[in-house]
């Protein structure tokens, strides 16, 4: 039951726009901003004027790096009802996957944009899976219908076959490629023909005879798909009755929110065709904050969970999903308010860090301009100035409440690293500050300093990711830096179970030191990370020393015996030990834990793990043999091939260490006619002969 206080939420939509790089996502967002009246002229990505791409590098490169959040308003066509649409434009480049993860976590619905000449591309698949993981309902937009090779059918087939989803086309294109002149609305059975370039003059008409049979067949399929999720419609369908437009819209909405069907629309954002109808579909089919399951939080030290319904009068629950350094106001924390109301000037409790923090000013964002507000209510997205400690994925609740944690954000491990040093010694400190600020904004970017060599290394998700961060260091923090060649972020692990002990005893006059632990270490499945278990019985290791022993073990994991890389995928069980009434201390047990772990890894048949990338190369048939031969020579495992138009897509798993400089080699092999995408898939053991070579380096 919706209360009066919640009624504004019925007309709220929090959506993300996500796709493969170059599918036309930012252009689609720009058009939405133009038609909702947030911008007075249309920003084109290819002339570097896009409003949403507000970082300098984004405008130069024509790709979206940070997820900009914008509030826009839209009146549903043919009605006076105004809707608030919060849009997050997410990057399509694989190196920026964390941005997509973050935005998926705080959305209620998404628009997946596909290039209709390419169908479902690899990054679109990744984004779709992320949306599946976070349970985000979505609609699909088959963009670029005017492009050579455009095919609405290709997109529908790919959604079914590559994504395993049920597409429900609610529109049909009137012609494609150069003949694309309008869109047929299958739900309302009307044709929309565009008569000017800006897409603002639309003539609505009956469906032309040439499309009548095809559209009638598609409408019958749409009603059948909608009837599967709506009992009332099913009864009408079985009795041969024709549903009204309202009944059909209501059933499609229900199926979309339950993630059983995925409405598919078509258009050309660049040519301004189909964008207003896309906005109508966002309003018609994607959920309001009241229609998605209420977020749950886990109560500290218990299995209990608490529900936070979307209600501005409820208890405050918010999630910080992005940190940004702003040249004018300092640190901006982007938040999604799930429940309650956040007031400027109030105090909040950061449950993730167990710290109290003060809210300064509150902003609603429009790409790179902002509007100051006094409060953010349940269902809203905004930015906070003044929070000192909040990080990505932190839970913010009302000051003084019990500690409750919302589900955080999955942060992938970086796979590539490089050494970095300032060009002048004078910039050393400035570089340190700049890198630290960049790492605060981006949890997939790590900065490490080697105490012995004094060398600083940075690690991230790919070459482009690190290149852009080094570029930002220069632009935003005025630090010129030299970087080394990219290196692979290896990991180490054990391959057999061992029992070991760590004993730290020091007697040198006065009070001594005594710590003693016995542990069992065993290998885990790849990707399982590290698991610690305390199974001490009878107090042989007192409770107050378990934590320090665990800390020592975890610190020792940071550097393995073979190459000094972190040790992963193992379980350590602390099962026994002994202590001394006087000499035992937290420090002694921490050292004992660390000693035990180092010995366990030495004795546990250690192995080196390397990141394996999922690579897809799109190549004309004539060059396919060369590409496959080359991937095999890079220790690649070919997973399969798939025809796409007159090209082939070769899919393979290839170690990252073999992929440096691949773009250049691929272009020269195919005279520039192939393209590829690559993203991290899993870690795998390095063959023995290569492990020996790595250790000699």
Curated annotation (Swiss-Prot):
Domain (tr-type G) ranges: 10-290
InterPro entries xrefs: EFG_II, EFG_III, EFG_III/V, EFG_IV, EFG_V, EFG_V-like, EFTu-like_2, G_TR_CS
GO molecular function: GTP binding; GTPase activity; translation elongation factor activity
GO cellular component, one term: cytoplasm
One of the GO BP terms on file: ribosome disassembly
Binding site for GTP: 19-26, 89-93, 143-146
Main location: cytoplasm
Protein's cellular compartments: Cytoplasm
Keywords: Cytoplasm, Elongation factor, GTP-binding, Nucleotide-binding, Protein biosynthesis
Role played: Catalyzes the GTP-dependent ribosomal translocation step during translation elongation. During this step, the ribosome changes from the pre-translocational (PRE) to the post-translocational (POST) state as the newly formed A-site-bound peptidyl-tRNA and P-site-bound deacylated tRNA move to the P and E sites, respectively. Catalyzes the coordinated movement of the two tRNA molecules, the mRNA and conformational changes in the ribosome.
HAMAP family, A to Z: EF_G_EF_2_B (MF_00054_B)
Family statement drawn from the similarity comment of this UniProt entry: Belongs to the TRAFAC class translation factor GTPase superfamily. Classic translation factor GTPase family. EF-G/EF-2 subfamily.
Protein name: Elongation factor G
Native source species: Deinococcus deserti (strain DSM 17065 / CIP 109153 / LMG 22923 / VCD115)
């Amino acid at each position: 039951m919706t209360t009066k206080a919640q009624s504004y939420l019925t007309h709220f939509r929090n959506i993300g726009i996500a796709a493969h790089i170059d599918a036309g996502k930012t252009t689609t967002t720009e058009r939405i901003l133009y038609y909702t009246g947030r911008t007075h002229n249309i920003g084109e990505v290819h002339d570097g004027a896009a409003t949403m791409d507000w970082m300098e590098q984004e405008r130069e490169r024509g790709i979206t790096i940070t997820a900009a959040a914008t509030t826009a308003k839209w009146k549903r066509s043919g009605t006076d009802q105004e809707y608030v649409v919060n849009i997050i434009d997410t990057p399509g480049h694989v190196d920026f996957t964390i941005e997509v993860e973050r935005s998926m976590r705080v959305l209620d619905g998404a628009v997946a944009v596909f290039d209709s000449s390419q169908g479902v591309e690899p990054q679109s698949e990744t984004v779709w899976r992320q949306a599946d993981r976070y349970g985000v309902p979505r609609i699909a937009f088959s963009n670029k219908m005017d492009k050579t090779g455009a095919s609405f059918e290709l997109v529908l087939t790919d959604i079914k076959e590559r994504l395993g989803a049920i597409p429900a086309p609610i529109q049909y294109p009137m012609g494609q490629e150069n003949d694309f002149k309008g869109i047929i609305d299958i739900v309302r059975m009307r044709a929309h023909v565009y008569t000017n370039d800006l897409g603002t003059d639309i003539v609505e008409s009956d469906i032309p005879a040439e499309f009548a049979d095809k559209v009638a067949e598609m409408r019958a399929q749409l009603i059948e798909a909608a009837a599967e999720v709506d009992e009332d419609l099913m009864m009408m369908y079985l009795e041969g009755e024709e549903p009204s437009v309202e009944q059909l819209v209501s059933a499609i909405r229900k199926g979309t929110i339950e993630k059983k069907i995925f409405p598919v629309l078509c258009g050309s954002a660049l040519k301004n065709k189909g964008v207003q109808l896309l906005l109508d579909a966002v309003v018609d089919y994607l959920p309001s904050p009241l229609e998605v399951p209420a977020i749950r939080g886990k109560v500290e030290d218990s299995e209990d969970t608490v529900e936070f319904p979307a209600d501005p009068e409820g208890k405050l629950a918010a999630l910080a999903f992005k940190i940004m350094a702003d040249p004018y106001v300092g640190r901006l924390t982007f938040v999604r308010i799930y429940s309650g109301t956040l007031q400027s000037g109030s105090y909040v409790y950061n449950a993730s860090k167990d710290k109290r923090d003060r809210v300064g000013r509150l902003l609603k964002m429009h790409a790179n301009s902002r509007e100051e507000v006094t409060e953010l209510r349940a269902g809203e997205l905004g930015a906070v100035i003044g929070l000192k400690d909040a990080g990505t994925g932190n839970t913010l609740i009302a000051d003084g409440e019990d500690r409750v944690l919302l589900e955080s954000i999955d942060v992938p491990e970086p796979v590539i690293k490089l050494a970095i040093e300032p060009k002048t010694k004078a910039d050393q400190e400035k570089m340190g500050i700049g890198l630290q600020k960049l790492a605060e904004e981006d949890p997939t970017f790590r900065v490490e300093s080697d105490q012995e060599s004094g060398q600083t290394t940075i690690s991230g998700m790919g070459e482009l990711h690190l290149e852009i961060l080094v570029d930002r260091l220069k632009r935003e923090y005025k630090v010129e830096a030299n970087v080394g060649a990219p290196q692979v972020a290896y990991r180490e692990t054990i391959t057999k179970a061992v029992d070991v002990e760590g004993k730290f005893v020091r007697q040198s006059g006065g009070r001594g030191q005594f710590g003693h632990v016995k542990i069992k270490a065993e290998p885990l499945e790849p990707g399982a990370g590290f698991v610690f278990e305390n199974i001490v019985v009878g107090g042989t290791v007192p409770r107050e020393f378990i934590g320090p022993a665990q800390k020592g073990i975890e610190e020792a994991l940071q550097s393995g015996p073979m190459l000094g890389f972190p040790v992963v995928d193992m379980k350590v069980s602390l099962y026994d030990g002994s202590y001394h009434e006087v000499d035992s201390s937290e420090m002694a047990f921490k050292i004992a834990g660390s000693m035990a772990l180092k010995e366990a890894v030495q004795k546990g048949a250690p192995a080196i793990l390397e990141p394996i990338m999922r690579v897809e190369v799109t190549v004309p048939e004539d060059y396919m043999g060369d590409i496959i031969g080359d991937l095999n020579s890079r220790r690649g495992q070919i997973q399969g091939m798939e025809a796409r138009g007159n090209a082939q897509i070769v899919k393979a798993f290839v170690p990252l260490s073999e992929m440096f400089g691949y773009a250049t080699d691929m272009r020269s092999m195919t005279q520039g006619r192939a393209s590829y995408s690559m993203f991290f898939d899993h870690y795998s053991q390095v063959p023995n002969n290569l492990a020996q070579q790595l250790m000699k380096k």
